[in-house]
Amino acid sequence: LIIDNQTHNVVGYIGNSDFNDIAHQGQVDGVKAIRSPGSALKPLIYALAIDKGLATPKTIITDVPVNYNGFAPENFNRKFNGNVAVEKALAFSLNVPAVKTLDKMGVPLFVDKLQQLGFEQIRKDSRILGLSVALGGCGVRLEELTNMYCTFANGGKFRPLQWLNPSNSTQPR
């Protein structure tokens, strides 16, 4: 999915490389399919925390073992880094600091922001989402994620994607 950041126009879209490839699920549209976002929502967690005055890029967070009623997030490499700045936690996609930041901010605030950004499955699941949403414990579509990042590129100003109608488009294909 390719979006013009200034206009929010969708200028390129390939849902799958080969629609007729049954063996590799060619008929699944990767742009519209609901998938785990993994760590792709972490920038929004930190952006909201900064907006709410809960953190700055230099704020120190402890990256140490933690347990939230049985939910014990770990980093990808299963190592902990002690004290880290928010900017380092984001740059290295550290899981524990992201979960701690989300816990401090509150899941409802984060879920509300995701809904404002047009995350449809998040809206449907809003009552059952918890801290694991920081690590991909939710369902999103690529088009929603892409528009979230487009919103970052526009200084936080959200607009819905503009789907071009090829029959009305004067742009070359």
Q: Model features per residue range: what roles?
A:
Residues 5, 20-21, 50-59, 120-123, ...:
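Secondary-structure transition/capping motifs at alpha-helix termini
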Residues 5, 9, 40-41, 56, ...:
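Extracytoplasmic
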Residues 8, 31-61, 89, 148-152:
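Active-site SXXK
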Residues 19-33:
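A short, polar/charged loop-to-alpha-helix boundary motif
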Residues 55-110, 158, 169-173:
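Conserved catalytic neighborhood of penicillin-recognizing serine enzymes
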